[in-house]
């Protein structure tokens, strides 16, 4: 299939392996608050990608992590006067309930940072040995000057723009322990009241980026087929993963395809936990069917940002009602209904950079044609094709 690779900046051919499963790593949630529709959109993209690859005879090994050691989690736990691990468990449990409600495929591996820290130490030691990192007062930093290509994925136009963006996303440019303001943390001393783990550099905790390198390489190997997440990870998270993973393993590329979903907006602002302008999945599924939410989220080009409009999302209930009607419509004894053209176009759309929004137009056409001919035409084969196509999009109604 053709798939857009963020690092290359264009579509390229993704060869689906025949002798092994395709490996997919997706950056998961930081469990300090409940899953929102923006998260659901990101995970829907990869859910449909997996379903499509499997429909074409491929296999996928899927790893999605939980970032349960991170500043936002500790800050929220401190604010709410709750133990950080209790908060994390509560929100992970809710997240899994939301995933079940949305009919998301369960990952093959679901590692939590808090259970993987011992595996990060050897990687950091390797980066120090390879001259990619340095120690300063119990902290370890990656030396970005050792990798001139650092940040090229983001196409931000130069050092100052990289630094400005990194600063907005957790970087501390004024840390006196750093050689360069853009250098990022591999291991850090913990703040008072935060959890710590032992290390050769003293007690502390890992930096954000090294966590994903350790988990992805442990469960999927040193080189991945696809690495994904939301577009907000295009910098600094994913470029940091690239340089530290390749700096440790010596193998390039770390990932064949970088796939990023667009961000979800609400009332003119990016939907985010920090802003508090959220539509929680747990609330949305009480107001409408999960299938209708899935239809609505799949109706946008996956790489583009979109504005979530509650009324439009609710209107997708009509599409699901029509789907259910078509799947159970009475079969007539007249001519056979031929929907092969729409079925072919449906799969062709997904084959061309996972164009879910285009695939849905052909799915809707199949539904409309079946409902128009129910009771008069022989629609059994068309219904079977519809069920298969709807299954690729992941509709529970098709199961």
Task: Pin down the residues of each PLM region.
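Alpha-helical recognition segments enriched in aromatics with Gly/Pro capping
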Residues: 1-32, 47, 118-331
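Short coil/loop linkers at secondary-structure junctions
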Residues: 59, 83, 105, 223, ...
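Short, well-structured beta-strand/strand-turn elements
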Residues: 59-61, 131-137, 370-371
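N-terminal, positively charged, Ser/Thr/Ala/Gly-biased leader segments
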Residues: 97-133
């Amino acid at each position: 299939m053709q798939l857009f690779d963020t690092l290359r900046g264009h579509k390229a051919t993704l060869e689906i392996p025949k002798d092994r499963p395709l490996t997919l790593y997706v950056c998961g949630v930081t469990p300090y608050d409940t899953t929102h529709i923006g998260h659901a959109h990101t995970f829907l993209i990869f859910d449909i990608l997996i379903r499509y690859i499997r429909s074409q005879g491929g296999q996928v090994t899927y790893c999605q992590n939980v970032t349960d050691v991170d500043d936002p989690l500790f800050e929220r736990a401190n604010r709410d006067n709750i133990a950080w691990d209790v908060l994390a468990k509560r929100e992970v449990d809710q997240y899994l309930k939301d995933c079940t409600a949305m009919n998301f495929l369960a990952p093959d591996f679901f590692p939590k940072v808090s259970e993987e820290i011992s595996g990060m130490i050897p990687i950091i030691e390797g980066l120090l040995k390879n001259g990619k990192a340095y120690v300063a007062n119990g902290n370890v930093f990656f030396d970005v000057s050792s990798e001139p290509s650092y940040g090229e994925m983001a196409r931000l136009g130069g050092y100052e723009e990289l630094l400005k963006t990194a600063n907005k996303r957790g970087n501390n440019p004024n840390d006196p322990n750093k050689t360069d303001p853009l250098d990022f943390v591999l291991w850090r001393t913990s703040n008072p009241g935060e959890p710590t783990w032992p290390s050769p550099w003293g007690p502390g905790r890992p930096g954000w980026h090294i966590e994903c390198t350790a988990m992805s390489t442990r469960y999927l190997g040193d080189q991945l087929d696809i690495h994904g997440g939301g577009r907000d990870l295009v910098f600094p998270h994913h470029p940091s993963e690239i340089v530290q993973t390749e700096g440790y393993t010596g193998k390039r590329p770390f990932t064949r395809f970088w796939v990023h979903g667009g961000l979800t907006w609400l009332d003119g602002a990016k939907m985010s936990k920090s802003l508090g302008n959220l539509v929680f999945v747990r609330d949305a599924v009480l107001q409408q069917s999960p299938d209708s939410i899935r239809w609505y989220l799949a109706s946008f080009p996956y790489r583009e940002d979109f504005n979530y409009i509650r009324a439009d999302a609710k209107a997708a209930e009509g599409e699901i009602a029509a789907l259910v009607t078509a799947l159970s419509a009475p079969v007539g004894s007249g001519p056979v209904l031929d929907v092969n053209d729409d079925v072919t176009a449906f799969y062709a759309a997904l084959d061309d950079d996972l164009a879910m929004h285009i695939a849905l137009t052909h799915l809707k056409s199949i539904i409309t044609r079946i409902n128009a001919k129910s009771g008069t035409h022989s629609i059994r084969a068309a219904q079977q094709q519809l069920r298969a196509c709807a299954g690729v999009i992941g509709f529970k109604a098709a199961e």
